[in-house]
Amino acid sequence: MIKLKDKLIYETLKLVESQGKGGLLCRNKQSDAEFMRPVNEFAAASGRNYTSIKSTLDIIHKNWGYLQRESIKDTGLDAGKASKIFIYRLCESGRSFIKKYEKALVQNADK
């Protein structure tokens, strides 16, 4: 049986994976910056808000280690309080989780 938590992790990891080797970029606070488009579109499409997505990324990074996270200082004019840009990249354990989850989806579909 697939758990809701696993589905949430899977969808978030797939978002990061879709951004390739450059990783998924975001700030602490929502922004209209072009690099934030993937996160904002994902939030809108999944019926979640930006803060929820950012929290999920941080929880996955801290609790399961499926994501690497680094931060860089944002020197853009619109940075304001959100002066750091976080870059999330998929780790090997994250790729492994995606494979296991997709295998479980196939097995459940066969039942």
Give the location of each predicted region.
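Short amphipathic alpha-helical interaction segments
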Residues: 47-63
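Short helix-coil junctions and helix-kink-helix linkers
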Residues: 34-51
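Alpha-helix boundary/N-cap detector
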Residues: 7, 30-33, 85-92
